């Protein structure tokens, strides 16, 4: 099972159950049936700081992915940590699904390009 730990630091209401379900659907479609994902909702200031720190771009963004590149075998019963997704509700507004899908696909190894776009199209 995919465990999704949600933290909302954005200061606005978020449909957390729908977001968790979407994360699970995308990962399931990618053949991931177990693991843990952090899903964090942040405000524009934190989004901007994270993008500046990690990508060198000084602007708020819709979503960021922080994959954990764990390919080593794990002991039985220990869940794989897939990474964290950070979403800024104030930037994405009602159109939060596409950026969330995009970020989750980064967690499973997709980079920008045709393969990513094809996978994103499956979740529209």
Put a short name on every predicted segment.
Residues 1-99, 104-124:
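An acidic/histidine-cluster motif and surrounding catalytic segment
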């Amino acid at each position: 099972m995919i465990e999704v730990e949600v933290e909302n630091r954005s200061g606005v209401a978020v449909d957390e159950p729908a977001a968790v379900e979407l994360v699970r659907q995308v990962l399931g479609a990618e053949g991931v049936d177990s693991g843990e994902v952090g899903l964090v909702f942040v405000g524009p200031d934190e989004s901007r700081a994270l993008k500046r720190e990690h990508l060198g771009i000084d602007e708020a963004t819709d979503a960021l992915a922080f994959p954990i590149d764990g390919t080593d075998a794990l002991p039985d019963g220990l869940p794989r940590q897939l990474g964290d997704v950070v979403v800024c509700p104030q930037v994405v507004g009602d159109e939060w699904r596409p950026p969330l899908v995009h970020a989750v696909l980064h967690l499973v190894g997709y980079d920008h390009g045709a393969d990513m776009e094809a996978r994103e199209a499956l979740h529209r």
